[in-house]
């Protein structure tokens, strides 16, 4: 399993094998001639670095020009003006009465479009902090390097019409995400940060704090990752004393699926889900996994994800996620004995895991983004527990607010105290600037 995963990784990233893109856009007209496109939204909208648009992936059905129309297949990146996307969001100033367009996954949109040339599209793509799913081609282009990764065609939506939902489940998800935004809006900046942690939506996250997370080497906390799933697994594990280990494992799987459905299947979330799924299957087969077994789970997840989700292979989130876990499994055991000589065992284990992940991801971070944050070695050890407590307390608070809405403002004080502690810690470590290579 490990040899197969290593060979596959070398073949993919050395460009010896170029996987076919199942989502490559195809239609019978030149891209420059396209004036209209219709299809279903297949990703969460995320604000671009310019702040003028929201970027999303559209699974195209039809395309047309002024004098003809044809069927289309594959995906495009659609840039929708902020005022249209934010029309339904709480606290925003825009209002499009009777013309509201819910821009969420599963919505069918009919748009008149204008193509954006690749040379001018870099400033209109999603920021890496908004989920960490920046493609390797975009990242390397931003660093001045060339990439042969095929680019998704980019279009600006000049007019957009909502034409229904793909199914009732997509509609339920969109309404649930909108309702969560309205609940968390009452908690101010604390609610904005919690919204980013729960759903991957960064519309209400304090921009200075988001930048501080990056400067402090903590961008992985804002990105949906395995850390979030591990918290759900830990919560479900407490039920094993009531229902048994196997039932608790099933509950963990249900909670993970529900979270991925609500937040969206980012590459790092899929990686974490596959690793846990393999581990749960092993548990049902009464197979005890050691650290070597955990590495086998990671290799199995890598093979499955590259086989079925080609679009993830060259994303920064995919590469950094696997590199981080590989570093924890392979490097941290060599660091742990040294740290145990002067640190308590629990702290040494946490520090060695952080060091392993940092050492494994630093070369990739330098190549993809042009900088590294050495302070992340220390900040992750201190801030990650604070973020976990804030995340768990926020989820519990939202649960009670949904049942008893009058508790919304009563719980606000607790959330604000936890947010202040987390914010202070992040801003402190952000004073140590990252090292730039550009």
Predicted regions span which residues?
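N-terminal leader/targeting segments
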Residues: 1-28, 127-132, 139-142, 154, ...
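Residue-level "contact hotspot" at macromolecular interaction interfaces
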Residues: 28-30, 35, 87, 101-102
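Short nucleic-acid-contacting surface segments enriched for D/E, G, S/T with interspersed K/R
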Residues: 85-111
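Aromatic-rich juxtamembrane segments at the membrane interface
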Residues: 148-275, 280, 284
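Internal transmembrane alpha-helical bundles of multi-pass membrane proteins
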Residues: 265-438
């Amino acid at each position: 399993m490990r040899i197969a995963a290593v060979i596959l990784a070398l073949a993919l990233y050395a460009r010896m094998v170029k996987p076919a893109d199942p989502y490559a856009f195809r239609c019978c007209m030149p891209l420059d001639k396209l004036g209209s496109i219709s299809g279903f939204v297949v990703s969460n909208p995320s604000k671009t670095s310019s702040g003028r648009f929201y970027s999303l992936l559209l699974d195209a059905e039809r395309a047309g020009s002024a004098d003809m129309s044809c069927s289309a297949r594959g995906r495009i990146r659609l840039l929708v003006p902020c005022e249209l996307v934010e029309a339904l969001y709480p606290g925003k100033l825009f209002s499009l009465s009777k013309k509201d367009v819910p821009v969420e996954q599963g919505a069918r949109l009919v748009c008149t479009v204008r193509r954006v040339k690749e040379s001018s599209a870099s400033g209109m793509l999603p920021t890496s902090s908004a989920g960490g799913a920046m493609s390797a081609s975009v990242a390397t282009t931003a660093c001045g390097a060339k990439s042969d990764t095929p680019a998704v065609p980019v279009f600006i939506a000049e007019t957009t019409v909502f034409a229904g939902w793909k199914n009732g489940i997509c509609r339920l998800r969109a309404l649930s995400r909108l309702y969560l935004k309205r609940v968390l809006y009452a908690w101010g900046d604390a609610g904005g940060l919690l919204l980013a942690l729960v759903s991957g939506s960064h519309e209400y996250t304090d921009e200075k704090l988001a930048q501080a997370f990056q400067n402090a080497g903590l961008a992985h906390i804002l990105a949906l990752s395995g850390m979030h799933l591990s918290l759900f697994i830990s919560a479900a594990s407490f039920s094993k004393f009531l229902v048994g280990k196997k039932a608790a494992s099933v509950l963990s799987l249900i909670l993970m699926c529900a979270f991925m459905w609500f937040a969206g299947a980012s590459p790092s979330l899929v990686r974490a889900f596959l690793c846990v799924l393999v581990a749960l299957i092993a548990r049902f087969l009464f197979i005890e996994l050691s650290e070597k077994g955990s590495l086998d789970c990671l290799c199995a997840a890598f093979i499955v994800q590259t086989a079925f989700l080609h679009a993830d292979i060259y994303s920064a989130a995919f590469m950094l996620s696997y590199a981080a876990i590989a570093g924890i499994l392979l490097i941290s055991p060599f660091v742990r004995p040294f740290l145990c000589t002067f640190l308590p065992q629990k702290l040494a284990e946490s520090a060695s895991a952080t060091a392993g992940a940092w050492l494994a991801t630093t070369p990739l971070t330098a190549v993809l983004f042009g900088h590294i944050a050495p302070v992340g070695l220390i900040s992750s050890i201190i801030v990650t527990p604070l973020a976990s407590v804030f995340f768990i307390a926020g989820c519990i608070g939202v649960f009670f607010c949904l049942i008893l809405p009058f508790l919304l403002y009563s719980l606000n004080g607790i959330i604000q105290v936890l947010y202040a502690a987390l914010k202070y810690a992040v801003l402190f470590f952000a004073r140590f600037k990252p090292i730039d290579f550009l």
